[in-house]
Amino acid sequence: MLGGQSGAGKTTIHRIKQKEFQGNIVIIDGDSFRSQHPRYLELQQEYGKDSVEYTKDFAGKMVESLVTELSHLGYNLLIEGTLRTIDVPKKTAQLLKSKGYEVQLALIATKPELSYLSTLIRYEELYSINPNQARATSKEHHDFIVNHLVDNTRQLEELAIFERIQIYQRDRSCVYDSKENTTSAATVLHDLLFGEWNQVEKEMLKSGEERLKDLTNRNGL
C-alpha cells in the first residue's frame, strides 16, 4: 500500500515495486478510474476543475471492488492512497491479512512546497492538451493530507498491521526501512517533510517554478 500527498510522486514507487515484483503486480490507483464515471464529461463541463469532488466516491468504490475481487484471486496488489485518514488503509490491510497476505506500507516523503508545485504543473500540462480534462488539486486538500500524514503514520505504526514500512524519496532512494531501522517511521517522515532542504530539493523547486512559469505563459493563464 502506498501513501503520500497529492503531487508527491507516488508513481516513483510504482516503478520501484514493479521492478521488485518483476512486473507481477496489479496497480490500483483510484484517480485512474475517475474518467470512467458514467457522467464524467458532463461533470467536467459543469464543474471544470472542481469535478474531482463529484468523482471521488465512484473512484473509491472502484478501488474497493477491485481490491476485494483481485485479493480473492490472490494477485499481488499495489494500492495507491494518500493516507488522508487511517480508516481506509487500516480496513484494507485487515481485509488482506485475513486472506493470508503480507501487507507492507510504502510512503513517499516529498517537501509540501514541491508536491503542491507538482500538482500545479500537472494541471497546466493537462490543460494544454485538453482544458476539459484538466484536473486540479485544491491547496486545502493537499495541505490537509500533509498535516495529517505524520500522525496517521504514527497511528498505523502503533497498530502494527504492516509487516514492513518503507519511506522513499523522489530520486527513488529508500531512506527508511522498518526491517533495518529502529527509529519510528513517523519521526523520519516528519524530518523529511518539514526539516532542512537538501541541494536536490532546492534544485527541484527552482526547475519546477521555471517549468510552471513556462506552461502558464504558454497556456495564457
Summary of predicted features, one role per range:
Residues 117-221:
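Conserved GTP-binding G-domain of TRAFAC-class P-loop NTPases and closely related GTPase folds
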Residues 13:
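Hydrophobic positions on the alpha1 helix immediately C-terminal to the Walker A/P-loop
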Residues 77-82, 104-106, 139-140:
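Short catalytic-loop micro-motif centered on adjacent basic/acidic residues
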Residues 5-6:
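The conserved Walker
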Residues 25-99:
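Conserved nucleotide-sensing/catalytic segment adjacent to the nucleotide-binding pocket
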Residues 97-120:
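Conserved phosphate-donor/acceptor-positioning beta-strand/loop module used by diverse small-molecule
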Residues 9:
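Conserved glycine(s) of the Walker
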